[in-house]
UniProtKB/Swiss-Prot annotation:
Autophosphorylated on Ser-290, Thr-312, Thr-446, Thr-449, Thr-455 and Tyr-610. Probable autophosphorylation on additional Tyr residues. Transphosphorylated by BRI1. It is not sure whether Thr-589 or Ser-595 is the target of the phosphorylation. The phosphorylations on Thr and Tyr are induced by brassinolide. Phosphorylation at Ser-286, Ser-290 Thr-446 or Thr-449 is not critical for flagellin signaling. Phosphorylated on Ser-612 upon SCOOP12 detection; a post-translational modification required for immune signaling. Changing D30Y: No effect on flg22 induced FLS2-BAK1 heterodimerization. This is BRASSINOSTEROID INSENSITIVE 1-associated receptor kinase 1. Changing A451E: Loss of kinase activity and loss of interaction with hopAB2/AvrPtoB. Reduced interaction with BIR2. Changing L464D: Loss of kinase activity and loss of interaction with hopAB2/AvrPtoB. The lineage of its organism: Eukaryota, Viridiplantae, Streptophyta, Embryophyta, Tracheophyta. Changing A495E: Loss of kinase activity and loss of interaction with hopAB2/AvrPtoB. Residues 26-225 are extracellular. The gene is BAK1. It comes from the Eukaryota. Its main location: membrane.
């Protein structure tokens, strides 16, 4: 009898525990479900948001921590419309709320002020209206606040000045009114953060007072004038010869040499969150740009490791392009625009140095180097990149590039996407570097740039033939970078000729796929520790990105969705059908079609005569 009673009690205990787990686990899921129900989703981006699941951690575009608590919601550029909901304030561990570039209307909920862990709030390029909630001043960890290109009105809440962690602020293109705060965190921001609003412009700094010169007798003036004239003549003779000699020496010296100037000619100022360093400060940090501190060199110049006075490690990129007169203001403007591109997967520009003869950019130091160095130049004591890390690198770098293409105004085309330009932070998170430099180095040109900047093996065929780059140029380079991640090999390697293989990595991979040799192309350092289906999916994304026609390549935002598991199968099936049609009717090849891998011949033939800049 007792045993019979124990069974139903045990059964009910399980049900109660299950109910408790579901209720606690679904608290955050309910908040996100409320958001889903408030939004129109024509592209079915939120289709996986199933409210019956225990937690939302398996949903697309949602990231959780090890405790199954939501830390990130990525719904930028998702073609969503509707309104935000107050339940968003019930995500206690949320760090990133990315809802930019949609058609969201209504007001910003005051409850967002409850998100005390929030680091980034990106609601720009929507149609939000009403005031900026003063409750956002509670977000003491907020670093990035971008509300630009909406219809927000009213005054800027003074509570925001107390958010001392704030590094990036963009309130531009909103009908905001009133005064711009100048205290607290707002003391760092420049007019670019408040452009095209109805805010009262910041007052210009008054010029320093000029001390009046006391009058002197006429006779004294004549004597003083005579003495001054004699001194001036003597000084002219004294400095004429050295000045002529210096001018002659500069003309004879190669134009790509750098001249050091005193730090006094480059006073330290701040441009928003961007610091302007003195040349002397960077000379000391890098031991006068010593060769022993060189981290790398490439088409834009050399990169030096440096240690600032406070002990912070930095990477100093010393640009090598010839300078032209009058380009300082444009260079400074471009640098500030680059600094506004802030994303978890983009290398943050910390500061710069500009003198009449020098252009230097200062970045955080990345202790784990680049993907290329981890794949091919790691010391024996360092373990190879495992497969999960490579997957994270693929997704992180795609997110960074998608941000450059879709959410920077004007958009930034990288023009040299490769493993050497994907850096790794302390957690081996991918950080895209060297973006914006191609345009920065062309700042003195007033015409369309036709010089091809890039690296052999990564250059898209249309960019090579026309000199015109686009987002799809970057997509091609990204696809080749994925193949580097999978194979561990270089995009262009003459050593493959020894085995009668293609020197171009893309062609080599296609050849192996046609021969059904999938295992032969996977990096041997992985030692078989990967899932075949995951490798195949990453190869599929790479091949879609490296199609000959730029029109047929996906956008980087589409690549992100495919890597997150949304739409790859359909896109791949469609491409396979098109390839089969081409091979059957238009472009017969010597290779038989392989079931599951129908690969067309590469058309990206790049001659060796084109310059390459290994980084």
């Amino acid at each position: 009898m007792e045993r019979r009673l124990m069974i139903p009690c045990f059964f009910w205990l399980i049900l109660v525990l299950d109910l408790v787990l579901r209720v606690s686990g679904n608290a955050e899921g309910d908040a996100l479900s409320a958001l889903k129900n408030s939004l129109a989703d024509p592209n079915k981006v939120l289709q996986s948001w199933d409210a019956t699941l225990v937690t939302p951690c398996t949903w697309f575009h949602v990231t959780c921590n090890s405790d199954n608590s939501v830390t990130r919601v990525d719904l930028g550029n998702a073609n969503l419309s509707g309104q935000l909901v107050m339940q968003l304030g019930q995500l206690p561990n949320l760090q990133y709320l990315e809802l930019y570039s949609n058609n969201i209307t209504g007001t910003i909920p005051e409850q967002l002020g409850n998100l005390t862990e929030l680091v980034s709030l990106d609601l720009y390029l929507n149609n939000l209206s009403g005031p900026i909630p003063s409750t956002l001043g509670r977000l003491k960890k907020l670093r990035f606040l971008r509300l630009n290109n909406n219809s927000l009105s009213g005054e800027i809440p003074r509570s925001l000045t107390a958010v001392l962690t704030l590094q990036v602020l963009d309130l531009s293109n909103n009908p905001l009114t009133g005064d711009i705060p100048v205290n607290g965190s707002f003391s760092l921001f420049t007019p670019i953060s408040f452009a095209n609003t109805k805010l009262t412009p910041l007052p210009a700094s008054p010029p320093p007072p000029i001390s009046p010169t006391p009058p002197s007798p006429a006779g004294s003036n004549r004597i003083t004038g005579a003495i001054a004239g004699g001194v001036a003549a003597g000084a002219a003779l004294l400095f004429a010869v050295p000045a002529i000699a210096l001018a002659w020496w500069r003309r004879k010296k190669p134009q790509d040499h750098f001249f050091d100037v005193p730090a006094e000619e480059d006073p330290e100022v701040h441009l928003g969150q961007l610091k302007r360093f003195s040349l002397r400060e960077l000379q000391v940090a890098s031991d006068n740009f010593s060769n022993k501190n060189i981290l790398g060199r490439g088409g834009f110049g050399k990169v030096y490791k440096g240690r600032l006075a406070d002990g912070t490690l930095v990477a100093v990129k010393r640009l090598k392009e010839e300078r032209t007169q009058g380009g300082e203001l444009q260079f400074q403007t471009e640098v500030e625009m680059i600094s506004m591109a802030v994303h978890r997967n983009l290398l943050r520009l910390r500061g710069f140095c500009m003198t009449p003869t020098e252009r230097l950019l200062v970045y955080p130091y990345m202790a784990n180097g680049s993907v290329a160095s981890c794949l091919r130049e790691r010391p024996e004591s360092q373990p190879p990149l495992d497969w999960p890390k490579r997957q994270r690198i693929a997704l992180g770098s795609a997110r960074g590039l998608a941000y450059l293409h879709d959410h920077c105004d004007p958009k930034i085309i990288h023009r040299d996407v490769k493993a050497a330009n994907i850096l790794l932070d302390e957690e081996f998170e991918a950080v895209v570097g060297d973006f914006g430099l191609a345009k920065l180095m062309d700042y003195k040109d007033t015409h369309v740039t036709t010089a091809v900047r890039g690296t052999i093996g990564h250059i898209a065929p249309e960019y090579l033939s026309t000199g015109k780059s686009s987002e799809k140029t970057d997509v091609f380079g990204y696809g080749v970078m994925l193949l580097e991640l999978i194979t561990g090999q270089r995009a262009f390697d003459l050593a493959r000729l020894a085995n009668d293989d293609d020197v171009m990595l893309l062609d080599w991979v296609k050849g192996l796929l046609k021969e059904k040799k999938l295992e032969a192309l996977v990096d041997v350092d992985l030692q078989g520790n990967y899932k075949d289906e995951e490798v195949e999916q990453l190869i599929q994304v790479a091949l879609l990105c490296t199609q000959s026609s730029p029109m047929e390549r996906p956008k980087m935002s589409e690549v992100v969705r495919m890597l997150e598991g949304d739409g790859l199968a359909e896109r791949w099936e469609e491409w396979q059908k098109e390839e089969m049609f081409r091979q059957d009717f238009n472009y017969p090849t010597h290779h038989p079609a392989v079931s599951g891998w129908i690969i067309g011949d590469s058309t990206s033939q790049i001659e060796n005569e084109y310059p390459s800049g290994p980084r």
